Amino acid sequence: MAIIKPHANKNRTTSPIERPESLIEEMSGSNPPIGFTSLDLAMIELEDFVHRCPLPGDNLAGQKE
């Protein structure tokens, strides 16, 4: 899988396609992230919302429970 960067510099001699692994290493640096990321928090919030939602009276097959 490759990532293509839009609006790449046309004078550039290297390919604008980079491997995700190299981008992850470049962005993470030597310090691992501490705590939850914003994606983690959003997923936790979504999971809590799903647990609070009432279940429908009909199952997926359309039969009453």
Curated annotation (Swiss-Prot):
UniProt KW keywords: Crown gall tumor, Plasmid
InterPro entries per record: VirE1
Superkingdom of the source species: Bacteria
Single biological process term from Gene Ontology: protein folding
UniProt KW Lipid metabolism keyword: no
A Pfam family of this chain: VirE1
Subunit comment: Forms heterodimers with virE2 that prevent virE2 anarchic homopolymerization and binding to DNA.
Additional information: The Ti plasmid contains at least six transcriptional units, designated vir loci, which are essential for efficient crown-gall tumorigenesis.
Annotated function: Involved in DNA transformation; controls virE2 polymerization and prevents virE2 binding to DNA.
Protein name (Swiss-Prot/TrEMBL): Protein virE1
Lineage summary: Bacteria, Pseudomonadati, Pseudomonadota, Alphaproteobacteria, Hyphomicrobiales
Gene: virE1
